[in-house]
Amino acid sequence: VIGGVDSLEVGRFNELTSEEDEFSRRLARNQQIILKEESHFDKVVDPAGGSYYIENLTQELANQAWKYMQELEAEGGILNALQEGKIHTDIEKVANARKEAMRKRKDVYVGINLYANPDENPPTQIQIPRESNPIKMEVLKAGALPQLRVVEEIENLRTRVIKSDKNRNIFLMNMGTINDYRVRADFATGFFQAGGFTVISPQGFMTVEDAVKSAKESNAAAYCICSTDEKYNELVPAICSALPDSFLILAGYPKDKVESFKENGIKMFIYMGADVVATLDELAKKLGVENEA
């Protein structure tokens, strides 16, 4: 609307999980109508005029699009690019980069790879019949352009874990004062909840004995130690010795201690920049969650 488009299609919020209904269709439609009819964006020649943010991004988008079109023309045009698979390859490169950013949480998708709702039930996806186009195009020999959703991997993992009948409780062994464990406990909670795991986060423990006792009583499938790097030097060997047969995770990645901590019995590390999908998928498999729920 702000850009002056002649037509616009906005997807329904539930288009992946249900057939079209009046409520979702109305919401998708009315967002743009409100901008036009109530905010009167269509009455102004250039609503975004003077906005460096919008104008700069618009110019950058136009420049990159024009550069890409020239590149396609130099290689024989868009039809040839489709037939040769160039466009498919370019889309795959962008998709892989976006997936990598999502997996390492450089790109945040609220409610999915960060701040996931632990009480949310996964929606039931349905197969919605679509009308097929009888027109056969020569270009389709190259294969259809893929429809990709960046968060699909982690959504599938989360659904798999939630639907599984395996124990998915993770007990946080918060050690020391609240200043010692709070940051990493919050990080660990968000990390595990993104994969559908249930987090048990008690108050801090001042002794290893108390932490081990509570951990055993929690009946959790795995335990995650949360504290400072300095305290880990004493805590990790002691906790690993007290829980030799347990799946122990460490919140953090002290590079100079990783190998020795592994020897002590730490099975997994979670930290900023870790691949959340790969890490949680490995955890799910270790806990017995099957690939297909």
Write out the residue ranges for each language-model feature.
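Short glycine/threonine-rich loop-to-helix capping motif typified by GTGT followed
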Residues: 18-28, 53-68, 87-102, 180-186, ...
